[in-house]
Regions:
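Short helix-coil boundary/hinge micro-motifs
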Residues: 1-270
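BZIP DNA-binding basic region
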Residues: 245-306
Length: 306
Protein backbone atom coordinates (compact mmCIF):
# COMPACT_ATOMS: atom_id res chain seq x y z
CA UNK A 1 0.00 0.00 0.00
CA UNK A 2 2.69 2.50 0.99
CA UNK A 3 4.83 1.49 -1.99
CA UNK A 4 1.87 2.06 -4.30
CA UNK A 5 1.56 5.71 -3.29
CA UNK A 6 5.23 6.39 -2.44
CA UNK A 7 5.72 8.32 -5.67
CA UNK A 8 2.24 9.81 -5.78
CA UNK A 9 0.71 13.03 -4.60
CA UNK A 10 -2.54 14.94 -4.56
CA UNK A 11 -3.99 17.95 -2.78
CA UNK A 12 -6.88 18.58 -0.43
CA UNK A 13 -7.82 21.33 2.02
CA UNK A 14 -8.53 21.02 5.73
CA UNK A 15 -9.28 23.69 8.33
CA UNK A 16 -7.87 23.75 11.83
CA UNK A 17 -11.30 24.00 13.51
CA UNK A 18 -14.76 22.73 12.61
CA UNK A 19 -18.12 22.95 14.33
CA UNK A 20 -21.56 21.40 14.07
CA UNK A 21 -24.30 23.96 13.39
CA UNK A 22 -28.04 23.58 12.96
CA UNK A 23 -29.54 25.11 9.81
CA UNK A 24 -32.96 26.66 9.29
CA UNK A 25 -34.13 23.30 7.96
CA UNK A 26 -33.41 21.74 11.37
CA UNK A 27 -30.57 19.62 9.99
CA UNK A 28 -27.09 19.59 11.52
CA UNK A 29 -24.10 20.50 9.39
CA UNK A 30 -20.33 20.29 9.77
CA UNK A 31 -18.59 23.48 8.67
CA UNK A 32 -15.32 25.33 9.38
CA UNK A 33 -15.50 27.82 12.23
CA UNK A 34 -15.70 31.49 11.24
CA UNK A 35 -12.02 32.17 12.03
CA UNK A 36 -10.66 28.73 11.07
CA UNK A 37 -7.52 28.69 8.93
CA UNK A 38 -7.17 26.49 5.83
CA UNK A 39 -4.24 24.20 5.16
CA UNK A 40 -3.37 22.52 1.85
CA UNK A 41 -1.94 19.03 2.31
CA UNK A 42 -1.21 15.80 0.43
CA UNK A 43 -3.70 13.11 1.58
CA UNK A 44 -1.64 10.34 -0.02
CA UNK A 45 1.12 10.87 2.56
CA UNK A 46 -1.37 9.92 5.26
CA UNK A 47 -3.36 7.36 3.27
CA UNK A 48 -3.19 4.37 5.66
CA UNK A 49 -3.86 6.41 8.80
CA UNK A 50 -6.72 8.25 7.10
CA UNK A 51 -8.46 5.08 5.91
CA UNK A 52 -8.04 3.39 9.31
CA UNK A 53 -9.48 6.42 11.11
CA UNK A 54 -12.43 6.57 8.69
CA UNK A 55 -13.16 2.87 9.19
CA UNK A 56 -12.92 3.14 12.97
CA UNK A 57 -15.36 6.06 13.00
CA UNK A 58 -17.74 3.83 11.06
CA UNK A 59 -17.16 0.93 13.46
CA UNK A 60 -18.27 3.13 16.36
CA UNK A 61 -21.67 3.37 14.67
CA UNK A 62 -21.71 -0.32 13.73
CA UNK A 63 -21.12 -1.13 17.41
CA UNK A 64 -23.79 1.40 18.49
CA UNK A 65 -21.44 3.58 20.52
CA UNK A 66 -22.89 6.64 22.33
CA UNK A 67 -23.77 9.51 19.98
CA UNK A 68 -21.44 11.97 21.71
CA UNK A 69 -18.52 9.57 21.17
CA UNK A 70 -19.40 9.21 17.47
CA UNK A 71 -19.77 12.98 17.06
CA UNK A 72 -16.39 13.61 18.66
CA UNK A 73 -14.74 11.01 16.39
CA UNK A 74 -16.29 12.52 13.25
CA UNK A 75 -15.14 16.04 14.16
CA UNK A 76 -11.66 14.71 14.95
CA UNK A 77 -11.46 13.01 11.55
CA UNK A 78 -12.65 16.13 9.72
CA UNK A 79 -10.11 18.27 11.58
CA UNK A 80 -7.35 15.83 10.60
CA UNK A 81 -8.29 15.50 6.93
CA UNK A 82 -11.07 17.91 5.94
CA UNK A 83 -14.65 17.40 4.81
CA UNK A 84 -15.43 14.61 2.34
CA UNK A 85 -16.21 16.80 -0.66
CA UNK A 86 -19.71 15.37 -1.10
CA UNK A 87 -20.71 18.26 -3.37
CA UNK A 88 -18.32 17.09 -6.09
CA UNK A 89 -18.50 13.37 -5.21
CA UNK A 90 -22.23 12.87 -5.79
CA UNK A 91 -22.85 14.25 -9.34
CA UNK A 92 -21.90 12.46 -12.54
CA UNK A 93 -19.10 15.02 -12.98
CA UNK A 94 -17.29 17.41 -10.61
CA UNK A 95 -17.54 20.00 -13.41
CA UNK A 96 -21.31 20.28 -12.99
CA UNK A 97 -21.07 24.09 -12.98
CA UNK A 98 -20.39 23.85 -16.74
CA UNK A 99 -23.81 22.28 -17.36
CA UNK A 100 -27.38 23.57 -17.22
CA UNK A 101 -28.29 21.26 -14.33
CA UNK A 102 -26.71 18.84 -11.88
CA UNK A 103 -27.11 15.18 -12.84
CA UNK A 104 -26.96 12.57 -10.10
CA UNK A 105 -26.47 8.80 -10.23
CA UNK A 106 -28.19 6.67 -7.59
CA UNK A 107 -26.91 7.50 -4.10
CA UNK A 108 -27.85 7.34 -0.41
CA UNK A 109 -28.52 11.02 0.04
CA UNK A 110 -30.44 12.59 -2.87
CA UNK A 111 -33.38 10.88 -4.57
CA UNK A 112 -33.62 13.22 -7.57
CA UNK A 113 -31.83 12.23 -10.77
CA UNK A 114 -31.23 15.89 -11.64
CA UNK A 115 -31.47 19.23 -9.82
CA UNK A 116 -31.28 22.91 -10.66
CA UNK A 117 -27.75 24.07 -9.90
CA UNK A 118 -28.91 26.71 -7.41
CA UNK A 119 -30.99 24.14 -5.50
CA UNK A 120 -28.06 21.72 -5.39
CA UNK A 121 -25.63 24.37 -4.15
CA UNK A 122 -28.09 25.32 -1.40
CA UNK A 123 -27.61 21.84 0.11
CA UNK A 124 -23.97 22.70 0.84
CA UNK A 125 -24.28 26.39 1.74
CA UNK A 126 -27.08 26.41 4.33
CA UNK A 127 -25.70 29.41 6.25
CA UNK A 128 -23.82 31.85 4.01
CA UNK A 129 -24.21 31.77 0.24
CA UNK A 130 -21.38 32.27 -2.21
CA UNK A 131 -21.64 35.08 -4.76
CA UNK A 132 -22.40 32.80 -7.71
CA UNK A 133 -24.31 33.75 -10.87
CA UNK A 134 -25.57 30.89 -13.04
CA UNK A 135 -27.14 31.37 -16.50
CA UNK A 136 -27.55 28.21 -18.55
CA UNK A 137 -24.11 26.66 -18.97
CA UNK A 138 -22.40 29.92 -18.04
CA UNK A 139 -21.43 30.58 -14.43
CA UNK A 140 -19.40 33.18 -12.58
CA UNK A 141 -18.23 33.38 -9.00
CA UNK A 142 -17.02 36.50 -7.23
CA UNK A 143 -14.61 36.06 -4.32
CA UNK A 144 -13.81 39.19 -2.35
CA UNK A 145 -12.99 40.46 1.12
CA UNK A 146 -11.17 37.44 2.57
CA UNK A 147 -7.54 37.17 1.45
CA UNK A 148 -7.29 33.51 2.54
CA UNK A 149 -10.31 32.55 0.44
CA UNK A 150 -8.99 34.53 -2.54
CA UNK A 151 -5.62 32.76 -2.21
CA UNK A 152 -7.33 29.34 -2.12
CA UNK A 153 -9.33 30.21 -5.22
CA UNK A 154 -6.19 31.27 -7.09
CA UNK A 155 -4.32 28.12 -6.01
CA UNK A 156 -6.99 25.84 -7.46
CA UNK A 157 -8.01 28.00 -10.41
CA UNK A 158 -7.30 25.16 -12.88
CA UNK A 159 -9.53 22.73 -10.98
CA UNK A 160 -13.31 22.38 -11.52
CA UNK A 161 -15.05 25.45 -10.09
CA UNK A 162 -17.19 23.36 -7.73
CA UNK A 163 -14.12 21.75 -6.15
CA UNK A 164 -12.61 25.15 -5.41
CA UNK A 165 -15.96 26.34 -4.05
CA UNK A 166 -16.02 23.39 -1.64
CA UNK A 167 -12.77 24.64 -0.06
CA UNK A 168 -14.36 27.93 0.99
CA UNK A 169 -15.14 28.59 4.64
CA UNK A 170 -18.89 28.83 3.93
CA UNK A 171 -19.05 25.23 2.70
CA UNK A 172 -20.87 22.69 4.90
CA UNK A 173 -21.85 19.03 4.74
CA UNK A 174 -24.88 17.46 6.40
CA UNK A 175 -23.74 15.63 9.54
CA UNK A 176 -26.00 12.64 8.85
CA UNK A 177 -24.58 12.27 5.32
CA UNK A 178 -21.00 12.29 6.55
CA UNK A 179 -21.82 9.81 9.32
CA UNK A 180 -23.62 7.49 6.87
CA UNK A 181 -20.59 7.44 4.58
CA UNK A 182 -18.30 6.35 7.43
CA UNK A 183 -20.80 3.66 8.36
CA UNK A 184 -20.97 2.42 4.75
CA UNK A 185 -17.20 1.98 4.63
CA UNK A 186 -17.20 0.05 7.91
CA UNK A 187 -20.05 -2.13 6.63
CA UNK A 188 -18.04 -2.94 3.50
CA UNK A 189 -15.06 -4.01 5.60
CA UNK A 190 -17.11 -6.19 7.95
CA UNK A 191 -18.87 -7.80 4.97
CA UNK A 192 -15.50 -8.80 3.53
CA UNK A 193 -14.16 -10.10 6.85
CA UNK A 194 -17.31 -12.06 7.73
CA UNK A 195 -17.47 -13.61 4.26
CA UNK A 196 -14.07 -15.25 4.65
CA UNK A 197 -14.26 -15.95 8.39
CA UNK A 198 -17.67 -17.63 8.14
CA UNK A 199 -17.32 -19.12 4.66
CA UNK A 200 -17.63 -22.73 5.84
CA UNK A 201 -20.48 -21.89 8.24
CA UNK A 202 -22.85 -20.19 5.76
CA UNK A 203 -24.83 -21.56 2.81
CA UNK A 204 -24.40 -20.53 -0.82
CA UNK A 205 -27.39 -18.15 -0.76
CA UNK A 206 -25.83 -16.22 2.12
CA UNK A 207 -22.49 -16.17 0.33
CA UNK A 208 -24.20 -14.69 -2.73
CA UNK A 209 -25.73 -11.96 -0.57
CA UNK A 210 -22.26 -11.07 0.70
CA UNK A 211 -20.92 -11.06 -2.87
CA UNK A 212 -23.73 -8.79 -4.07
CA UNK A 213 -23.07 -6.41 -1.19
CA UNK A 214 -19.38 -6.19 -2.06
CA UNK A 215 -20.10 -5.79 -5.78
CA UNK A 216 -22.05 -2.63 -4.97
CA UNK A 217 -18.90 -1.10 -3.48
CA UNK A 218 -16.99 0.88 -6.04
CA UNK A 219 -16.68 4.28 -7.59
CA UNK A 220 -15.47 6.33 -10.49
CA UNK A 221 -11.71 5.92 -10.84
CA UNK A 222 -9.91 9.26 -10.47
CA UNK A 223 -7.90 10.62 -13.36
CA UNK A 224 -4.17 11.13 -13.00
CA UNK A 225 -1.14 12.55 -14.78
CA UNK A 226 2.63 12.31 -14.43
CA UNK A 227 4.64 15.21 -13.04
CA UNK A 228 8.40 15.49 -13.52
CA UNK A 229 9.57 16.52 -10.05
CA UNK A 230 12.82 15.26 -8.48
CA UNK A 231 11.62 11.94 -9.95
CA UNK A 232 8.54 11.00 -12.01
CA UNK A 233 5.49 11.34 -9.76
CA UNK A 234 1.86 10.32 -10.26
CA UNK A 235 -0.54 13.17 -9.46
CA UNK A 236 -4.03 11.85 -8.65
CA UNK A 237 -6.84 14.25 -9.51
CA UNK A 238 -9.16 13.57 -6.58
CA UNK A 239 -12.13 15.91 -6.92
CA UNK A 240 -13.40 14.75 -3.53
CA UNK A 241 -11.75 13.30 -0.45
CA UNK A 242 -14.47 10.65 -0.51
CA UNK A 243 -13.21 9.35 -3.86
CA UNK A 244 -9.63 9.37 -2.57
CA UNK A 245 -10.52 7.38 0.54
CA UNK A 246 -12.62 4.99 -1.52
CA UNK A 247 -9.68 4.24 -3.82
CA UNK A 248 -7.13 3.90 -0.99
CA UNK A 249 -9.53 1.68 0.98
CA UNK A 250 -10.02 -0.54 -2.09
CA UNK A 251 -6.27 -1.12 -2.43
CA UNK A 252 -5.94 -1.82 1.31
CA UNK A 253 -8.88 -4.24 1.19
CA UNK A 254 -7.14 -6.44 -1.38
CA UNK A 255 -3.64 -6.12 0.11
CA UNK A 256 -2.50 -9.62 1.11
CA UNK A 257 0.76 -8.51 2.73
CA UNK A 258 -0.79 -6.12 5.28
CA UNK A 259 -4.48 -7.02 5.41
CA UNK A 260 -7.14 -5.02 7.22
CA UNK A 261 -8.33 -6.79 10.35
CA UNK A 262 -10.83 -6.29 13.18
CA UNK A 263 -9.41 -6.67 16.68
CA UNK A 264 -11.02 -9.66 18.41
CA UNK A 265 -11.08 -7.74 21.70
CA UNK A 266 -11.79 -4.04 21.06
CA UNK A 267 -13.27 -4.27 17.53
CA UNK A 268 -10.82 -1.66 16.28
CA UNK A 269 -9.72 -1.83 12.63
CA UNK A 270 -5.97 -2.27 12.22
CA UNK A 271 -3.36 -3.12 9.60
CA UNK A 272 -1.99 -6.57 10.26
CA UNK A 273 1.60 -7.62 9.63
CA UNK A 274 0.38 -11.23 9.36
CA UNK A 275 -2.68 -12.70 7.68
CA UNK A 276 -3.78 -14.49 10.87
CA UNK A 277 -3.40 -11.61 13.35
CA UNK A 278 -6.45 -11.35 15.60
CA UNK A 279 -5.48 -8.48 17.92
CA UNK A 280 -4.45 -4.88 17.30
CA UNK A 281 -1.98 -4.87 20.21
CA UNK A 282 -0.37 -7.09 22.85
CA UNK A 283 -2.50 -5.32 25.46
CA UNK A 284 -5.73 -6.32 23.71
CA UNK A 285 -4.51 -9.90 23.40
CA UNK A 286 -3.69 -10.06 27.12
CA UNK A 287 -7.02 -8.49 28.14
CA UNK A 288 -8.93 -10.89 25.89
CA UNK A 289 -7.17 -13.89 27.43
CA UNK A 290 -7.78 -12.57 30.96
CA UNK A 291 -11.52 -12.11 30.32
CA UNK A 292 -11.67 -15.51 28.63
CA UNK A 293 -9.94 -17.13 31.61
CA UNK A 294 -12.30 -15.41 34.07
CA UNK A 295 -15.26 -16.64 32.04
CA UNK A 296 -14.00 -20.23 32.22
CA UNK A 297 -13.41 -19.93 35.97
CA UNK A 298 -16.95 -18.67 36.52
CA UNK A 299 -18.36 -21.56 34.50
CA UNK A 300 -16.30 -24.08 36.48
CA UNK A 301 -17.35 -22.46 39.74
CA UNK A 302 -20.98 -22.69 38.71
CA UNK A 303 -20.64 -26.37 37.84
CA UNK A 304 -19.00 -27.13 41.21
CA UNK A 305 -21.81 -25.35 43.05
CA UNK A 306 -24.31 -27.43 41.16
Amino acid sequence: MNNLFAQSRSHWVRYDRYEIKTGKDGKRYITPEKTAKPDIYNPLKESSDMVLEALNVGMLMMNRSPEDEVEKAILTFVTHYGLLGLMTALPTTPSFMDYEAVYLPKNHFIKEESMETEDYLALFYPFDKLDVVKKGVESSWNVSGDNMMIALTMTFMNEPMAKTMSFQREYAEAYDWVAQQFKDWAFTLTTSILYYNDYDLIDEDTRNLYRMGMAAFGGIAPSYHIELLDKPTIYWDFHSLLLGIQMMFSFMLVDGEKPLRLCKHCQKVFLSSRSNSAFCSARCKNQYNVYKSRGKNKEQGGEEND
